[in-house]
Amino acid sequence: MINVRRRDFLKGSATVAVGSAVVGWTGGGLAAAPEPHMEFPTEPRERMAVASWPFRMFIDAPTNKWARDPKLPGMDLKDFGAMVVKTFGLHNIEPLDAHFASTEPAYLAELREGTEKAGAHIIDVPVDLHDSFYDTDPARRAKSVAASKKWIDIANTLGSPSVRLHIAGSHDTKPDVDRTAQSLRQIAQYAAEKNVVANLENDDNFTEDPFFIVDVIEKVGNSYLRALPDFCNSMMTHDQDFNNRAMEAMFKHAYCISHMKDSEVGEGGKVRTVDFAKCFAIAKAAGYRGYFSMEWEGKGEPYAGTQQLIDETLRNLA
């Protein structure tokens, strides 16, 4: 989360058109495996990824115009992996859906080719959905399910083992575990067929409260629906004690990805910091073996900020 949240802009922007077909399907099978099986690396640098979100001011894409700074050099998402490898020496990336210049098959093929040619891999695709899983209108819930399935197909095409699905709000309706679980049960079943993990993140502190997420995951009861613990998001509205309990609950249900950050800028430019060493300790105690994606949201420019997160992560994974 940031001072001006991406949700507010993306809700008013046109949704990237999802192509009717996808290319290069490599995951999944004729029958869904009972649970995901990924061979996670153990070397610290190989467990790290870089998210495209902190670099939004550089990225050229139709749905990123609100964040693009024309005074800065532009970058297509196809080149993001090469930048990460060259600048940070890391080989895993996490491209946000709004940073895709297109979702047509030809562009997806170019994105995957450019990323892999640079020696990088896509390990998660965060998706900011516009319709709510818990909307009281069944038609809107159906739209959220359909959009999720399309992005699972896209992740499959790109060779990404997972997506992060945003739980969008619904007018004045409070988050509802039963309706959310009903929607996500369908999505998790589809994700299993494609061998793609669907993750839920404690991002929006109203619609994505960490304990609400845990309740939903437990109600769905599908191993392809997992938690994505973000180190600092809950600190925007809560204290360190709450964050510790939230991380403990989330990491029990995490599988393949977590967002590492040490601070976040909130309303009025106020900087919230988090005990990130405690977060790493909680992850280790939970037996978490997945990736940590660097998502710089502190003050200053993202290159130095991301390097700071990398250095902090290396010290904690040593």
Q: Where do the protein language model's features map onto the residues?
A:
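Active-site cleft segment of glycoside hydrolase catalytic domains centered on the general acid/base Glu
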Residues: S170-L184
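Acidic/histidine-rich catalytic cores of soluble enzymes
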Residues: P62, N92-I93, A181-I282
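Active-site groove signature of glycoside hydrolases
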Residues: A155-K174, V196-D203
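Structured beta->alpha junctions
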Residues: H99-F100, G169, N202-D204, D239, ...
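Residues at the N-termini of beta-strands
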Residues: N92, S162, I257, G290-Y291
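Short acidic/histidine-rich active-site segments
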Residues: S293-E297
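N-terminal pre-domain/capping segments
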Residues: I2-T157, P175, A192, N222, ...
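A short helix->loop->beta-strand "cap" motif at the edges of active sites that frequently abuts
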Residues: A120, V196, A286-G290
